[in-house]
């Protein structure tokens, strides 16, 4: 799934250390979900095609960063598999700012990282801004670093205000939300409650999440899935634990390598 986001996004992971290595940003997407889907259909019964099709259902075009991709995948992943089952999402769709605000100096558009399709709610991954503030000022260009961090912080605040003026509530997601037990659970439930209040959603799409989000056994398993995806060394161990658990439960444990030159 995460490889799909990378191939269809504007970043690449370190080929030698994809989990913890540095990512490169601002690259052209290698392909897109539609073209991969066409290839899978063309491949027919080739080994791994069905597994690839299942994975592709959780991939969306135009992710701008690995962490954004992780949050999007978890939002799409069913609760039975350790995700949140929030329905469809869209990534980095540009929203035009009201002309009246642009005339007062606001940016002419803003781009929320993730939107819950059919709602006015979304997410922005804001990373480790406060750590950067604490670390800036220690080097030769500390003053410039601190000013840059401050400018980014202020722009994030203005971004959220301007999106709110467009009728969109965009919740920040931090690295602490992902690493802390049930931290992301709280953010996702907040998004659901806002969507129900703001968009008057009554189709039951969020009923499962609200019913199951507080169950301790599911919270623990879901957090283990989250930890298995994150860019830190223990992630490999959590991923192996989950694979071993699936194998013991009778799921086939296989690694399918498919080279797709689309």
Describe the predicted segments one by one.
Residues 1-27:
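Hydrophobic alpha-helical segments and helix pairs
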Residues 25-262:
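Surface segments flanking catalytic/ligand-binding clefts of nucleic-acid enzymes
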């Amino acid at each position: 799934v995460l490889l799909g986001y990378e191939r269809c996004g504007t970043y690449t992971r370190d080929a030698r250390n994809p989990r913890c290595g540095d990512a490169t940003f601002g690259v052209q997407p290698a392909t897109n979900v539609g073209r991969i889907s066409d290839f899978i259909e063309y491949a027919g019964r080739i080994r791994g095609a069905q597994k690839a099709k299942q994975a592709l259902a959780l991939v969306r075009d135009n992710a701008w960063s690995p962490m954004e991709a992780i949050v999007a995948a978890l939002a799409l992943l069913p609760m039975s598999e350790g995700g949140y089952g929030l329905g469809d999402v869209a990534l980095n769709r540009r929203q035009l700012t009201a002309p009246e605000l642009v005339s007062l100096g606001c940016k002419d558009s803003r781009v929320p990282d993730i939107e819950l399709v059919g709602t006015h709610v979304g997410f922005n991954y804001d990373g480790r801004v406060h750590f950067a503030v604490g670390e800036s000022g220690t080097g030769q260009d500390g003053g410039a670093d601190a000013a840059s961090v401050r400018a980014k912080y202020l722009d994030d605040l203005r971004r959220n205000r301007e999106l709110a003026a467009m009728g969109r509530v965009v919740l920040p997601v931090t690295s602490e939300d992902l690493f802390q037990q049930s931290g992301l659970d709280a953010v996702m439930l907040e998004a659901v409650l806002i969507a129900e209040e703001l968009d008057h959603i009554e189709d039951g799409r969020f009923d499962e999440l609200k019913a199951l989000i507080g169950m301790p056994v599911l919270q623990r398993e879901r957090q283990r899935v989250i930890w298995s995806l994150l860019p830190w060394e223990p992630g490999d161990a959590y991923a192996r634990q989950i694979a071993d658990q699936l194998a013991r439960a009778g799921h086939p444990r296989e690694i399918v390598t498919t080279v797709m030159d689309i």
